[in-house]
Amino acid sequence: MSQCRQVNGPILLGTYHVDIFCTFEVQHAHTQKNDQTKGMKIVIIGNGIAGTNAARFIRKRTDHQIIMISEESWQPYSRTALMYVYMGHLKLKDTHLYEDWFWEKNCLERIQSRVNRVDIHKKQLQLQDGKTLEYDKLIIACGSRPNKFGWPGQSLKGVQGLYHLQDLESMEGSTLDILAAGKNARAVIVGGGLIGIEMAEMFHSRHIPVTFLVRENSFWNQVLPPEESDMINRHIREHGIDLRLNTELKEITGDAAGKVSEVYTNHGDRIACQFAGLTVGVSPNIDFLQESGIKLNRGVLVNEWLETSEKDIYAIGDCAELQQPDSGRRAIEAVWYTGRMMGQTVAQTICGVKTAYKPGIWFNSAKFFDIEYQVYGDVPAVLPAHLETLYWEHPEGRKSVRINFEKNGGAVTGFNLMGVRYRQEVCEKWIKERTPISQVLENLSLANFDPEFFRQYESEILDQYNRQNNTNIRLSSKRSRNQVSRFLSNLGQQSNA
């Protein structure tokens, strides 16, 4: 690796600033190489967070040849940050996972092309331009594609999802058509999930009227419990969004130029618009693998080591489907955090240290306009019979805390947070250790991660629990830096034990 210079320094990872030290020669001196893995050619299909993280961690441990292939873009970027480019908060270059110099200096080769076919017998890829590419080990990290359900008119200009960089570019072009309509300007968004509400906020930031069609009787109610879902319903409408629940798309019609002009609903309503956003979920992007011989279901089937049915082929990220997911986890998790973890895990295995994928306690976060959302652990939309819940909501209706716990013994199982930030390490420790709800409430200030001078709500939450359960639990102390540091220090010592 004499041609690869040592690189130290900070790197922008999406909207997170992290320090990565790529001191390869030093790391090699401290990492025992496996002779069987020397000099391999590793090909990664996809350059999202899963594929990029796999490449990064393989490079930190080995000098294998690494080639990344993506049809979508030359420069890997943070998909979750695309909305902020449209809203003017970021420039496109700010979404790049790494600086421009990162790839060459770390000897990561990139090819911008589509993979048409995988030949598992020849260990060869056939690319769109007719070229072939051999591999010793293959990592499939090809992500997802937006769902379409055969609606009439779904191929008209101005009808799209929001997943790829090209979608953002198309959305910018459609915005010109919307604004040209003057007082008749309107965007219609179909689908009550995270991408749908992101798209609504994007148009709202440019003062474009939005109609939001949600099939369910409340926003994202297959994930959020009723109280939180209703809070977001209100919040969406507070922003002037025309939220229509229990409403489905039936047809999209266009004008003579092939552009969307109207949307028809199941209630017979006709909504004039210049844009129709289809945000009804995503599916693994695996059509090119149908004839490969690799076992598929909804996604690419993998075991706990992220191995597919074929030797030397792995799958990670949105396209991977675990055959036996851990308790509390789904077989397919199209989430940034899981893609990142999968990339690091498969890198360990490829570098000779076979490592099972153990994602741990479920975590996710999102933002609904002005309300931040976090979930740790098991907080289903419908409370199971073996659980109880403590739900507190601020009178203003924009903040809430939910803590689920077992009826027998009171062990805490999950946290749902709206507009309030809790420390992930603290919540996960309580869940892992099956800490009783009473002990959690006594020490709830340790979890609060809001800035120091923000108002704290632990006393109100505790008072509500006491009223509901006729108890007299009290906070053990106020939050302090020293207490939180000691708690996290103990956590670190236990993890290293």
Where are these regions (language model features)?
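Cysteine/selenocysteine-centered motifs that mediate thiol-based redox chemistry or coordinate metal-sulfur cofactors
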Residues: 438-495
